[in-house]
Structures are given as C-alpha cells and as structure tokens.
Amino acid sequence: MANEFKFTDVGEGLHEGKVTEILKQVGDQIKIDEALFVVETDKVTTELPSPFAGTISAINVKVGDVVSIGQVMAVIGEKTSTPLVEPKPQPTEEVAKVKEAGASVVGEIKVSDNLFPIFGVKPHATPAVKDTKVASSTNITVETTQKPESKTEQKTIAISTMRKAIAEAMTKSHAIIPTTVLTFYVNATKLKQYRESVNGYALSKYSMKISYFAFFVKAIVNALKKFPVFNASYDPDQNEIVLNDDINVGIAVDTEEGLIVPNIKQAQTKSVVEIAQAIVDLANKARTKKIKLTDLNKGTISVTNFGSLGAAVGTPIIKYPEMCIVATGNLEERIVKVENGIAVHTILPLTIAADHRWVDGADVGRFGKEIAKQIEELIDLTVA
C-alpha cells in the first residue's frame, strides 16, 4: 500500500516552506522518523521525518520548490513504474576551441610644430614607434596594439528565507524599541572555584560538565523573580504591560543558517543542572536542524553569550516584543585592590539592554545588581 508523505504544519502560523535538501532518492528504503527532506521557513530550517517506513516510490518536489500545507511531497510504499518527478537530464560534454588573437590598429596622428612652441621642443619617436614612417608633412603613422578590457566580476549572495526574516525582525526591533544599556563587572571568583569543585561530580552523575553560561542563566532567572517587569512585554493593542507568569529564557544559538533563539520553557522551575541540559539540547537541535517552532515560540527574555566568541562587551538587540536581553561576556582574570593588598579576581562583564519606554536606567541598574549578587554570593546556584 502506498502512503503519501505530506507537508504538515510544524508550528504556529506556518503555511509554506522552501525545500533546501532532499536526503533520499527514489528506490531508497526509509524508516519511521528518518529524515527525508530539509525545509526552510521564515523562522527555522528543519528536517522533515517520515511518518512511514518502506521504499520511496516517488519524490514530487525538487530543491528550491516552495511547498504548502497538505502538499504531497513523496510517496512511500508500492513502487511505481514511472516516477512522478522527471529525471534531470545529464549534461553533455562539449569541447570548444577558442582562438585568441590580438588585433592591431593602425592610425595616423598628425603632429604640428605648433603643438611644441616652448623651448623649441620637437617631437621624438619613442622605442615603440621608432620604425614608423615619418612623412615630410610631419604625419606620423603609429601602430598600436588594442588591449582587452579587464573585467571585475561581482559576486552575489542569495538571501535565504530565514535570513530575510532575521533582517526584518532586527529592523523592527531596532526601529521600535529605544534601548537603555548598562554594563556591570561581576566578581565571579567564588563561582569559578565552586564550578571547578563540582564538575567532577556533575560529570560522573549527569555525564556533563556544568557550563558557566548555565550558572549565569540561573542567576538571571532568580533575579527576575524580584524584578518581573524585565520578564514582561508590551501589548500595543491594549496599551498595557503584560507580566508573564512563566520565565521562558531564549538562548541565542549561532548556526550556519543564522541566529536562532530557542527558549527554555518554565526556567523558573529548573535547577542549574536542568538548565545546563536544556542549553545543550536546544543548541544541538538548532545546529542539526531538528529544532521545532514550539522551541522558538513564547520566549519572554533572551540571553546571549558574547564570551563564546571571546568578546567582553557589546550592544545586544532586544527581541521584540520582549522587554529585555542580557549578554554575558568573556571571563577575565584581573588584579584588583582588596583590603590587605591586591588579589586576582575572575570578572564577568554583564550587559543589560532594556526597553526604555517602560523601564528607566535606574531600574536596569537595580536588576543588574541583583544578578551580580546572585552570582557573587552563589544564591541558589548549587549542583545537587
């Protein structure tokens, strides 16, 4: 029995997608949940797994096609004698011989004595024209070689559906939201020591080390419980600020297709270990094109890690309609003055950008100090 592989809705509001890869051929065997296509939407590039097992008898689309919800992309099951997609013609080899020849142009240049009136200057033949014939009338015949024009080729980059969506979202955010930005330098010395002491335990119990980023996200979540306005969004239709009950922390992930921001759902209920596991899981799914739109929707605040690229400070752009984005920079060892002399401390640059329409710089300052307190005093950051 033949089964139709249809393009189904993989997320809220999705109506179509662009086929970017076809991972199987007609005649191949495929298993249930094995990827058959890669499709790009305006929010994500994701694999489409097969809901059926069997032999692929037809593939009805090609790379570059835009498919709509319900469209039959392939047939799995009984083999058909004639595939639904015509095979691509094989290119023929042609050998062309091109002869290049330089064209010589012979022209006459009439030179008058009046052209050289100063200091008795007379025209002299250069080596390039010394064999030309000079007439008594001062006519000079010069043989010149025409040089081919050099052409500078320009390269173009096609804008993907996802890149276009990113551009539109960033432009919208930058145009609508006036940001206030503050940077804090947080003493993460105790956190560094604590992380080093528990990573062996975490590796043996959870098969993973706990990243600094997981601790930072947990500290931000803790601080949001005291400053919920930074976990809010503005509703222009009702002209009111909506305080979100859940803290869904968006994690900026750098992928080949561009920046993807999946979010950790209900982060306020998770431990440091659970947050660390969620970060790894979402990043892997994003980079292997297995992310779902449900992972991207309903974020309430975003966090980005400048430190992963060695950067300390930057100006992050808020993801509209969120209220805030927090950026963590590269950890640095600094010599600082202490009560009994000097000491080496581990310093975390922490940057907060917030919507200045609804919060002031002083609010951002208090929020930043609370995050710093959570990190410096290791409040609720233990690994159990």
UniProtKB/Swiss-Prot annotation:
Keywords: Acyltransferase, Lipoyl, Transferase. Gene3D superfamilies: 2.40.50.100, Chloramphenicol acetyltransferase-like domain. GO terms for cellular component: cytoplasm. Its EC number is 2.3.1.12. It is an enzyme of class 2 (transferase). Its cofactor is (R)-lipoate. GO terms for molecular function: acetyltransferase activity; dihydrolipoyllysine-residue acetyltransferase activity; lipoic acid binding. The modification N6-lipoyllysine is found at K43. Binds 1 lipoyl cofactor covalently. This is Dihydrolipoyllysine-residue acetyltransferase component of pyruvate dehydrogenase complex. InterPro entries: 2-oxoA_DH_lipoyl-BS, 2-oxoacid_DH_actylTfrase, 2-oxoacid_DH_E2_comp, Biotin_lipoyl, CAT-like_dom_sf, Single_hybrid_motif. It holds the Pfam family Biotin_lipoyl. It catalyses: N(6)-[(R)-dihydrolipoyl]-L-lysyl-[protein] + acetyl-CoA = N(6)-[(R)-S(8)-acetyldihydrolipoyl]-L-lysyl-[protein] + CoA. Belongs to the 2-oxoacid dehydrogenase family. The active site is at H356. Residues 2-77 form the Lipoyl-binding domain. Forms a 24-polypeptide structural core with octahedral symmetry. The pyruvate dehydrogenase complex catalyzes the overall conversion of pyruvate to acetyl-CoA and CO(2). It contains multiple copies of three enzymatic components: pyruvate dehydrogenase (E1), dihydrolipoamide acetyltransferase (E2) and lipoamide dehydrogenase (E3). SUPFAM superfamilies: CoA-dependent acyltransferases, Single hybrid motif.
